[in-house]
């Protein structure tokens, strides 16, 4: 079993629909644990970082001065938009290319993972702490205390349900 610390309410609903349930001690219980263990232990679903790093070390021998110049030209706009200085030496650029190749190799291995039957991620929400009682309680439909705060109560000027912002900002003339 897998112990969890925090989980979003939507994740609990999605997990419950897929046969994953949470026990009172914070452990996840799955209906079909044998299938999950079989998938996790199959050789085609396993690879190690040593394997990935050793593969990328062999490909680093192929970097020529021509490749170095081409990559430098392609990376220049990326460095500029990120407000980073270009590497000042060929050794630094060589190291950067080696790191990028390792990362691309990792991404290609991740793309090879079978994700059939996995729902795509539709949104990212902040993770909140939940107790077991909150996770198992029925939703009453009443808004929680964080929803009851009226943001307009702090506004100096308002028009209906909108803030009013005055345009009385004076522009200072530049002094020389």
Curated annotation (Swiss-Prot):
It is an enzyme of class 6 (ligase). It holds the Pfam family GatF. Coiled coil: none annotated. One of its GO terms (molecular function) is glutaminyl-tRNA synthase (glutamine-hydrolyzing) activity. Its EC number is 6.3.5.-. CDD domains: GatF (cd21422). Keywords: ATP-binding, Ligase, Membrane, Mitochondrion, Mitochondrion inner membrane, Nucleotide-binding, Protein biosynthesis. Transmembrane segments: none annotated. GO terms for biological process: glutaminyl-tRNAGln biosynthesis via transamidation; mitochondrial translation. It is found in: Mitochondrion inner membrane. It is a peripheral membrane protein. InterPro entries: GatF. Subunit of the heterotrimeric GatFAB amidotransferase (AdT) complex, composed of A, B and F subunits. Allows the formation of correctly charged Gln-tRNA(Gln) through the transamidation of misacylated Glu-tRNA(Gln) in the mitochondria. The reaction takes place in the presence of glutamine and ATP through an activated gamma-phospho-Glu-tRNA(Gln). Required for proper protein synthesis within the mitochondrion. Belongs to the GatF family. This is Glutamyl-tRNA(Gln) amidotransferase subunit F, mitochondrial. It comes from Yarrowia lipolytica (strain CLIB 122 / E 150).
């Amino acid at each position: 079993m897998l112990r969890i610390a925090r989980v979003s309410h939507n994740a609990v609903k999605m997990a419950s629909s897929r046969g994953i349930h949470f026990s009172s001690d914070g452990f996840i219980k799955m209906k079909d644990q044998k299938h999950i263990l079989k998938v996790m232990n199959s050789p085609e679903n396993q690879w190690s970082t040593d394997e990935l790093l050793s593969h990328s070390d062999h490909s680093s021998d192929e970097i020529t001065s021509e490749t170095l110049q081409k990559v430098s030209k392609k990376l220049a706009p990326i460095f500029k938009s990120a407000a980073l200085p270009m590497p000042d030496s060929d050794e630094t650029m060589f190291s950067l290319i080696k790191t990028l190749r390792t990362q691309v190799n990792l991404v290609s291995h991740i793309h090879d993972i079978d994700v059939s039957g996995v729902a795509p991620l539709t949104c990212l929400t902040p993770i909140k702490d939940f107790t077991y009682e909150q996770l198992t309680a029925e939703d009453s439909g009443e808004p929680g205390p964080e929803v009851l705060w009226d943001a307009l109560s702090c506004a100096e000027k308002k028009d209906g349900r909108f803030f009013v912002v005055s345009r009385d900002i004076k522009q200072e003339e530049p002094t020389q």
